[in-house]
Amino acid sequence: MGSQWTKDSVYRKAMKAGYRARAAYKLLEIQQRNGIIRPDDNVVDLGAAPGSWLQVLRDLTDGRVIGVDLNPIAPMEGVTTIVGDFTDPLVQERIREEAGGVVSVVVSDASPKLSGQKSYDQARAIGLGEDALAFACTVLKPGGNMVIKSFQGELFGELIAETRKHFYSVRGYRTKASRKGSAETYIIAKNFKGTCDDAEGPL
């Protein structure tokens, strides 16, 4: 772990609280400010490793909590984890089965591996957001909610516009726990319209 991480006050706070990553505080703030997760919601976390958002979700809902990632996630009580690509129809079918056929909320803190080239990284993050939106439109029940991470840039407005086709309330939100200088911004989408037409492919 690099020194810039260990000197990070949010990181130290997360480790002291028993969270697997500092990102836990981002979801806690999003929930406090936006009320995305309700007490009995079934929630799917995309790109869930190492599992800090799953830890938060487990405490926010008595519903089913399912984490999906290409990499294994260390087990935790009250959480189902799936190793696989969430864009794979077979993985999506298993997610539906684990959720009992009803998914109330989709969240994603997933980020592409960054190259340091701002425009390239932003385009890849937008692509990942498109995939998460298409997934949410496939599995969410009407009235469901979604939170996905993206990066500010020239394509961000297009992803917001696409999301508004499928949710009644959509806004961008930057958390206080985000690192200074980071372009990351979360899309908070509430009240899914129940339609998934045109939610696939490039913007």
Curated annotation (Swiss-Prot):
Gene Ontology molecular function, alphabetical: rRNA (uridine-2'-O-)-methyltransferase activity
Catalysed reaction equations from the record: uridine(2552) in 23S rRNA + S-adenosyl-L-methionine = 2'-O-methyluridine(2552) in 23S rRNA + S-adenosyl-L-homocysteine + H(+)
InterPro entries found in the cross-reference section: RNA_methyltr_RlmE, RNA_MeTrfase_FtsJ_dom, rRNA-MeTfrase_E, SAM-dependent_MTases_sf
Residues the record marks as active site: K149
Localization: Cytoplasm
Family recorded in the similarity comment: Belongs to the class I-like SAM-binding methyltransferase superfamily. RNA methyltransferase RlmE family.
Designated name of the protein: Ribosomal RNA large subunit methyltransferase E
Originating gene: rlmE
